[in-house]
Amino acid sequence: MSAQSLTHDARRILLAQALRALAYGFGSVLLGVTLDERGYSSTEAGLIIAAVLAGTVLASMAVGRYADRLGRRRCYAILYVVLAGVGVAFAASHTVWLLIAFALTGALSTEVVESGPFTSLEQSMLATELSGDARVRGYGAYNAVASAAGSLGALAAGGLSLLHDAWSGAPADGWFFLVFVPVALAGAAVGRSLTDHVEAAPEVRRRREPAQRLGPSRGVIVRLSGLFALDSFGGGFVVQAFIAFWLANRFGASLGTIGVVFFAVGVLQTASFLVAPRLAERFGLLPTMVFTHLPSNLLLAAIAFAPNLATAVALLLARTLLSQMDVPTRQAYVMALVTPAERTPAAAYTNTARYVVRPIGPVLAGAAQSVALGLPFLIAGSIKSVYDLILWRWFSRVEIPSEDATPPPPAPAARGAR
């Protein structure tokens, strides 16, 4: 999907997303290394990262309930302003509970692609741009932009080690969270430049009752939400900030090395997002989701046994090449399974299900590290593999309706379930 085929608002949204992903890619490296540099324990680091994820849940729920009435553009710009404040707090404060409080605002994210309340708003605002056969390609481009910008941010963070080598008086790494301030303010300006076309319909803005409930596709979405929650729970053990922390702690990897690794991760993610639509067109959405995701999770589990940094990085990069192909296909799959009237609540249900369980992972990962430093990788890979197998078992026979067809019947129950 070329930029010329997008509307003015869609291009602006992708620009704002790119700015945010640049900051998140920079921060994902910086956060893990800074937590290690400041001497926080594994438990304290896990609590801070968990607070970031919990804030994602709370802010996403608030956006889902109030953004259409308060104004999507207004909420979008406010989130960017809050992100600027978070940058100041993480640069200036070493107090664990203060960092947790700012993390709970939901403006910070440990991921560059699916980043909580921002993503929820963007999916709503881009919905009119993504329809029919172009949907999966559109989502692929949307995620690729974030991944590419995030990889550049990670590379920039890696360059800080060169700065310290060249300048003995360079400030501590944590102070570079101030980079969030100009980036976030630029994102806010872009958000405010969007037109009224991205807002909800006037009748939606005037109403007082909650958003429409799911209709005939309720059974399908409830099952998918549960499965997506399981996958997200497993992913919470190995968020990017944790991986940076683990590489630094386990192998003594420098900030520069980690930055280069995450840049390579971002490049492979971008390629993955762009290849996924082509695979989906040939093999189908669900086969692409499952049969790229499952091998990636086996590689993830294998990282726990890496004897050295080179092996760990090789496994991580191989896993990354496959692991993100399910993202645009998953987004398109959910939208294809429901009626047009159900798309907004379906997105809200499935996104919230992913976000709400994710904060548990970093806390448990911190505890698991006390048993074995690489144990979170083994746990994550196992949980996410179970998700793939159940997803295929439950949905491999569920047909995707055409745009004009009625919604699918509820997915078959698991064997033995009543």
Report residues per predicted region:
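Helix-loop boundary and gating motifs at the non-cytosolic
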Residues: A3-A54, V220-F228, S232-F263
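Hydrophobic core of transmembrane alpha-helices in multi-pass small-molecule transporters
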Residues: A18, V86, V96-P117, T311-M325
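Transmembrane alpha-helix termini and helix-breaking/packing motifs in multi-pass membrane transporters
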Residues: G32-V33, E37, S151-A172, F176, ...
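Central cavity-lining transmembrane alpha-helices of secondary-active solute carriers
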Residues: L47-R65, F263-V275
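Helix-to-loop junctions at the C-terminal end of transmembrane segments
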Residues: A59-G71, S161, S272-L285, Q369
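Structural signature of the two symmetry-related core transmembrane helices
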Residues: R74-A89, P287-A302
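Intracellular juxtamembrane helix-capping segments at the cytosolic ends
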Residues: L108-L130, M325-V338
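C-terminal membrane-cytosol helix-exit motif in multi-pass small-molecule transporters
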Residues: A157, S161, V181-P202, Y387-F395
